[in-house]
């Protein structure tokens, strides 16, 4: 895909993880440019894609049930929770099918420590940025395109301040869990100053 070529051309040297929805060809495009990247399905998108098959009065119970799967402490516990989930919700085959097609991505989460997993399934920075843009642009019409660009630029500056002062919770634990894997350790060491 062109987007990954553009990232490479702009200087991105390595990508460890990519969280994406199931758009056809996207995973192959990512892997062709960043072959060492781990491609992960976005849990939020999987929930959204499956919940459309669930009656609204059952949303909360359904999401709590699936959270027991991806939030499990181990792969064995996740597989057990998944079996329970399938048995509990099999009256909605459309919802179950979404998870069956993508369960391999849930399983691969457990190749990493709990701190890494939490970041992989709870962080969706791009959607957060898009949501922020929608908030500032829904205020009305703009006299011209340049006015819109200025507003978006100012919002980006505000977000940048947050990003510069913010931090990823438990980052030292995440880093240590990644450093246990020699493949990640060698890649991380290229970018860390000691």
Task: Report residues per predicted region.
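Conserved, well-structured core segments
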Residues: 17, 121, 150
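A glycine-rich phosphate-binding loop feature that marks nucleotide/adenosyl-phosphate handling sites
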Residues: 21, 100-107, 168-174
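Short, conserved catalytic/metal-binding motifs centered on acidic residues
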Residues: 18-21, 45, 99, 126-130, ...
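RNase H-like nuclease fold core
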Residues: 1-19, 24, 28, 32-36, ...
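Amphipathic, well-packed alpha-helical segments that form the structural scaffold of globular domains
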Residues: 4-5, 100, 104, 130, ...
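Basic, amphipathic alpha-helical segments enriched in Lys/Arg and hydrophobic/aromatic residues
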Residues: 131-194
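Extended amphipathic alpha-helical interaction segments
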Residues: 31-125
């Amino acid at each position: 895909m062109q987007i990954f070529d553009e990232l490479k051309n702009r200087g991105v040297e390595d990508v460890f993880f990519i969280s994406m929805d199931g758009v056809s060809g996207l995973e192959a495009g990512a892997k062709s440019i960043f072959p060492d990247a781990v491609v992960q399905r976005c849990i939020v998108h999987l929930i959204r894609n499956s919940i459309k098959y669930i009656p609204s009065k059952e949303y909360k119970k359904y999401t709590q049930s699936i959270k027991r799967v991806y939030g499990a402490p181990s792969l064995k516990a996740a597989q057990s929770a998944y079996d329970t989930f399938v048995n509990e919700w099999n009256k909605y085959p459309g919802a179950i099918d979404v998870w069956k097609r993508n369960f391999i991505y849930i399983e691969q989460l457990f190749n990493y420590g709990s701190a890494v997993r939490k970041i992989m399934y709870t962080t969706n920075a791009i959607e957060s940025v898009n949501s922020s843009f929608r908030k500032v642009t829904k205020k009305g019409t703009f006299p011209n395109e340049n006015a819109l660009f200025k507003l978006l630029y100012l919002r980006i500056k505000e977000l940048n301040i947050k990003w510069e002062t913010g931090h990823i919770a438990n980052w030292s634990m995440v880093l240590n869990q990644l450093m246990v894997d020699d493949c990640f350790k060698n890649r991380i060491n290229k970018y860390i100053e000691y």
